[in-house]
Amino acid sequence: MPKILIGIPVLDNIEMTRVCLQTLYKHTSVDRLGLDVSLVIIDNGSSDDIAGLIKGEFNGARFPTYYLRNPQNLGVARAWNQVLRFSASATYGSAFYYNYYVISNNDVLFGPDWLQPLVEAMETDDRIGLVSALENGSPVMQELLDAHSRTKKYRVSPKKHYTSENIMGSVKMIYKKWGGHESFCRFVKGNNLPLFIKGNRSAVCFMVRPAMIQQVGFFDEDYSPIGISEDLEYFLRIERIITPPWITENTYPEEKKWKYGFCGKSIIHHNWCMTRQGLHFDGRKWEKQKEKNWKAKFGKSKKYYTKHFLGMFFMPILSSFLEDFLLCLPFH
């Protein structure tokens, strides 16, 4: 019985978190593979009552749910690493307790039977280190790109007050032409996409293999809480473009690089860039500071790395990467 830990970092956005958890509990199927699933919420210093939400609305949930609160925002990389080090049954920080770990944004709505296909993809090849769920915007199918365009039109504004009902209403409009999000997920699953689509990347909702973390390392926590674009750094590390001192030809040879990609049978909806936005969040200032942090750490800009290496390894998603950045800037 494979043990799976799902970790969701949260910073406020209680209404978005409510909808995220509602769809998680509804659509996390386990019977086909006999999965033993647990959930941990990493609260990165929220002022919203996230603990009250979990203890109240989600008390007695389908599978064990744990809550870990940081006294302040420690950044996404620290929260991701807290997920990887978490265990309710073993000493915190000891060897990996779970067979696989899922890390997801809290601005995600999960589609029907989203989890089991991720495990099935991992089980096809023990050199797959990371596999991501498909989302609106994944560049593997035109309808996913269409859904991304509709998301830009209908998503709730992070600059205005919204409720869980507003969120579900926006999702209904986004997927109306397909009969709703659940119907859209079934449509995508029925299009015979490969179980594992190698080479694409997303850090919105992804599963990792502990052996890869042991070899390549944990996520980079420098410059927290703003960070350095931890997901980009990690994918470049997997490709051996960025090599911390512990990555050498002996410890991580070129011919043994880990594989990563999308799972063609796992579909979610992403409410683009709602994880850290709010009434007083300045996305442009945040991204500028990330760029400064990146250049201070690596000596060259992120633009240098995306120009020289994204085109080499990530060309299928380059346009989507740029589009996502523009979408994440604040509303005017």
What are these regions (language model features)?
Residues V108-I167:
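Conserved donor NDP-sugar-binding/catalytic core segment of glycosyltransferases
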Residues G199-G217, S224-S266:
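A short, conserved alpha-helix in the catalytic core of glycosyltransferases
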Residues G169-V208:
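A recurrent flexible, glycine/aromatic-enriched loop bordering the glycosyltransferase active site
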Residues I4-M16, C20, H27, I42, ...:
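A conserved hydrophobic helix/loop-capping motif in glycosyltransferases and polysaccharide synthases
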Residues Q22-L35:
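Short, acidic, metal-binding catalytic loop of nucleotide-sugar glycosyltransferases
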Residues S94-L109:
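Short beta-strand-to-loop acidic/aromatic patch adjacent to the donor-nucleotide binding site
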Residues T23, I41-G52, Q72:
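A conserved acidic beta->alpha catalytic loop
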